[in-house]
Amino acid sequence: MAGTRVRPSAGPSTSLVPAIRVFDSQRMDPNSPATQRAFFGRRKGHPLRARQVALFNSLLPKLVPDLTKPAPADLRTLFDCPLDQMRLEIGFGGAEHLIAQAQANPRSGFIASDAFVNAIGKALVAIDDHKLSNIRLHFGDASELLDWLPAGALSRIDLLYPDPWPKRRHWKRRFIQDDSLKRLARILKSGGELRFATDIADYAAWTLARVLQSPDFVWTAEQASDWRQPWPDFAGTRYEAKAKREGRVPAYFIFRKK
């Protein structure tokens, strides 16, 4: 997600085996065929660099929530720093937005999910470079994480530039569906926000049509500039910059949990 559209990996890496013990049998070696399958079928990427491989072994096991155990009632206990609120980013791609938000909001805890090996690798490098203690990572299908998180635990969810699945026969694979909106609403606090950005007009319309019919959310926009302009605290991404260069106009939606 987050506009991450990458090419097939050159093949598996055996040097990652120690780190992969933190994952279940469905997600073994991050560079193996078993894990080259993303949310709804795309988890391909370039081979990891040496530093990323090292961080998969040394840092990632410290950041991964154990989904085989019940989630703590207070997610702040997953972190070693004082926090006021919890947020979720689904499909963080190059991690530019995630890292910028974590730096700007040190008292917010971030759980970030991505099914792409390369996205996890980039995030690990950035977390290590900036010595961030308020991020936890989930490597795999975001639906697993949505089912694990406790009700009303989050203040905000960011879903930025998810795969639009442009072919009509694939629309059922789009992240925004009636069922996924219910699942997102369950884990948001009352008054919490779902923020969604896309550069695909059809996906923007698709999302609005479903959210406006949802009993759980209200669209906060009062004028066109509210969704045509980035949010005041929005950190742009490389994918977004590329979309703008190619003439696509992003839409920025904020939906509030009732």
List where the protein language model places each region.
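A cross-taxon signal for low-complexity, glycine/charged-rich
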Residues: G3, R7, G11-S13, V17-R21
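S-adenosyl-L-methionine
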Residues: I20-L88, E96-Q103, L124-G152
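Conserved glycine-rich SAM-binding loop
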Residues: G93
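Conserved SAM/SAH-binding beta-strand->alpha-helix loop
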Residues: F116
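A short glycine-rich, Lys/Arg-flanked "PGG" loop and its adjoining helix->strand segment in the class I
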Residues: I176-S190
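Conserved beta-strand signature within the Rossmann-like core of class I S-adenosyl-L-methionine
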Residues: S190-T198
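Class I S-adenosyl-L-methionine
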Residues: A209-K258
